[in-house]
Amino acid sequence: MEIKNSPSSLTSPASYNCSQSILPLEHGPIYIPSSYVESRHEYSAMTFYSPAVMNYSVPSSTGNLEGGPVRQTASPNVLWPTSGHLSPLATHCQSSLLYAEPQKSPWCEARSLEHTLPVNRETLKRKLGGSGCASPVTSPSAKRDAHFCAVCSDYASGYHYGVWSCEGCKAFFKRSIQGHNDYICPATNQCTIDKNRRKSCQACRLRKCYEVGMVKCGSRRERCGYRIVRRQRSASEQVHCLNKAKRTSGHTPRVKELLLNSLSPEQLVLTLLEAEPPNVLVSRPSMPFTEASMMMSLTKLADKELVHMIGWAKKIPGFVELSLLDQVRLLESCWMEVLMVGLMWRSIDHPGKLIFAPDLVLDRDEGKCVEGILEIFDMLLATTARFRELKLQHKEYLCVKAMILLNSSMYPLATASQEAESSRKLTHLLNAVTDALVWVISKSGISSQQQSVRLANLLMLLSHVRHISNKGMEHLLSMKCKNVVPVYDLLLEMLNAHTLRGYKSSISGSECCSTEDSKSKEGSQNLQSQ
C-alpha cells in the first residue's frame, strides 16, 4: 500500500548517523590547545604553531538532533578501530614533529581508559612511542579530511618530505636542499612564517621546514595521493601513510642530529622554554590537613605532572631520537628529581613556603600531620633557599632541568651491540644542553672566573636534588605499603619501576638486562591477551 505525502528524503536515525557523520568544520566548536606557557624571560618566544596541529571538535549528530552541539573530546583517536592487539591509546599517530606539539595531549584526555591496562613499563613505552599529542592527522571519519601546511599554515596539498605541506613550501624545500642555498636572516632569526609572510625571509622559512620535521628522504613517493578536494579517507589509511613515512625517515638518523647541531645555544634555550609544561591545578582539601588528605593531594598532583613530563621530555631536541627503551629508562630514573626541582623553582620567590601548585601552597608546619614528611620539607626549603641565594634565572633552571633528565640513568642504556651508538647520542645531547647553560651564564655580565664558580655551584646543587628525591621516593613507597594513600596510573608504574631497579642493583649487568627484557615481553603478552 503506497503512502502518499511521505517525504522520500526522510532519513532514519540509523542512516542519519552514517550519512551525517561528516559536518562542516565551521559549525562546530573549535579547541585550540597552546604549547606556549607565559613565563618570565627576556626573549620573545619563537612560536612554531600551525593549524596542522590543531584539534577540531565537530558537533555530534546523534543524541542531539535538535541542533545543540554536544561537547566531544578533542582527541578522537580513541574512537578509531584498534589493530587487534593494541589498546586505543596505542593507535595514536607517531608524529616526527619536535616543536609543534600542544601541551594538552590527547592520551591525557583519554586517561579514563588507562585503568584497564596492566601497570608495567609497556604503558610508559606506548606513551613515549606515540606522539603524546596532536599529530598532523587528527580527524577521524566524523570530520572533514582537511590538512594544513606545517610550515606556513596554508592548506596542504599532500604529504611531502615527511610532513603535510603546501605546494609552495614543498617546492621551496626542494630548491633549498638541491641548490645548497646559504640563506641569511636580515633580522634576528625569529621571523614569523605564515601564509602571507612565508616569502619574506628564506632563512627562517628553511629553519621552520627543518623544525616541523621536513627531511630529505621524505620523497614524493610519500604523498599518499592526497588532494585538497573533499575526498574521504579512512583513519586506517592515514595511520598507514604516517607509519610509512616514519619507516623511511628512520634510514637517515643523522638528519635530526644535524638539526640539533644547527641550533645555537640561544635557540636551544628558547626551544626548552617552548617545551615547558603548564601549571597543574589540584583542589586543596578541607582544613585541617590529615595524613590521608595531604598524601592524596600530593599523589594526585604528581600523577598529573608525570603526564606533562613525558610531553616535555619529547620536546627536548634529540630526545625522541634515542631508542624507546632509553627514553623509558631516563624518565624512570629522574621523574622524582624533575618534580622536586620544579617545586623548588615555583617556591624560589616564597621563602618558607612550598608552592606545589597555584592552589596548593604549604607551610613547613603543615607537614607535621604526615609521618616522615617534615624532614623532606626541611630539605626542600633549604635547597630552595640556596637557589634563591644564587638568584637562579629562569633560563638556567630550564637547562638544569634538562640536564637532570639526560644525566639520570646510572645503568647501561642499551645492549652491548647498541651501547656505543646510544651513548654517543646521549652524550651529544647532554653536551648541547651543557653548552646552552654555559651560554646563559656568560650572558649574565660577570667575569669568566665568576662564571666558572656559578656553573660549579649550580651543578653541585644537583646532588642535593637527587638526595631529596631519593628520600621522597622512600617516603612515598612507605605510604603505599602502609595503605595510607592509594597510588594509581602512571605514578604507580614509576614507583614499580623504581622498586624493580632497586632489586636489580644487586644483580650483574647481564642478568639485569635479561630480567628487564623478560619483564617487557611479559607486559607485551599481557596487552595482547586483553
Swiss-Prot record:
Tissue specificity note: Expressed in prostate, ovary, Leydig cells and in epithelium of the efferent ductules and of the initial segment of the epididymis.
Q: Which residues are recorded as modified (Phosphoserine)?
A: S61, S87, S105
Extract the ranges annotated as region (Disordered): 506-530
Q: Where is the composition biased (Polar residues)?
A: 506-515
Q: Which GO terms describe its biological process?
A: androgen receptor signaling pathway; brain development; cell population proliferation; cellular response to estradiol stimulus; epithelial cell maturation involved in prostate gland development; epithelial cell proliferation; estrogen receptor signaling pathway; hormone-mediated apoptotic signaling pathway
Q: Name one GO molecular function term.
A: steroid binding
Extract the PROSITE patterns matched here: NR_LBD (PS51843), NUCLEAR_REC_DBD_1 (PS00031), NUCLEAR_REC_DBD_2 (PS51030)
Give the UniProt keywords, A-Z.
Activator, DNA-binding, Glycoprotein, Lipid-binding, Metal-binding, Nucleus, Phosphoprotein, Receptor, Steroid-binding, Transcription, Transcription regulation, Zinc, Zinc-finger
What's the reported outcome of changing S105A?
Answer: Abolishes stimulatory effect of Ras
Against SMART domains, the record matches this protein to:
HOLI, ZnF_C4
Q: Which Pfam families match?
A: ERbeta_N (PF12497), Hormone_recep (PF00104), zf-C4 (PF00105)
Zinc finger spans (NR C4-type)? Answer: 149-169, 185-209
Q: What does this protein do?
A: Nuclear hormone receptor. Binds estrogens with an affinity similar to that of ESR1/ER-alpha, and activates expression of reporter genes containing estrogen response elements (ERE) in an estrogen-dependent manner.
Give the quaternary structure: Binds DNA as a homodimer. Can form a heterodimer with ESR1. Interacts with NCOA1, NCOA3, NCOA5 and NCOA6 coactivators, leading to a strong increase of transcription of target genes. Interacts with UBE1C and AKAP13. Interacts with DNTTIP2. Interacts with CCDC62 in the presence of estradiol/E2; this interaction seems to enhance the transcription of target genes. Interacts with DNAAF4. Interacts with PRMT2. Interacts with CCAR2 (via N-terminus) in a ligand-independent manner. Interacts with RBM39, in the presence of estradiol (E2). Interacts with STUB1/CHIP.
Domain-related comment: Composed of three domains: a modulating N-terminal domain, a DNA-binding domain and a C-terminal ligand-binding domain.
Name it: Estrogen receptor beta
Which source organism does the UniProt entry give? Mus musculus
